[in-house]
Amino acid sequence: EETRVISFHGYGPGPEGIAWKNLRDWITENCYEEMVETQRFFGFNNPNPSPGSENYGYEQWMTLPSAYEGKEGETIKTLPGGLYAVGGFRYSTPEAFGPAWEALNNWRVDSEFVYDESRQWLEELLTKASVLVEKSSVDFDCYMPVIKVKA
């Protein structure tokens, strides 16, 4: 099912922190702290890291209530629905993401699904308390868009 999100971007050697700071600032500046418990938080590299460069981008999304109309200057997007394979993990260092994605991809190789390149892979933050206060260890789910090809 389609979902509307607000988008924040970061770019540099640690873009996740920049994107999260932009989202946190927007939440506090607009007094939307009460929305944190009822919304979902997704992120992904955008653009991906390039060989030889420590700089890359990260885009952070927060789902929006259906009644939210948006304000001038906000980037509102629609996340398409579809089928995703999901794998969860606990994050304590940035290096934790690689093995989590590798495990999900290894599952896919032997499954009845193929990667759906038309949709974005996502990382969903599950530890809501860390949205407003940065935590060193949080729970994430990795979402790989897939299409079922085998019966």
Each language-model region and where it sits:
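A solvent-exposed interaction/effector surface
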Residues: E1-A151
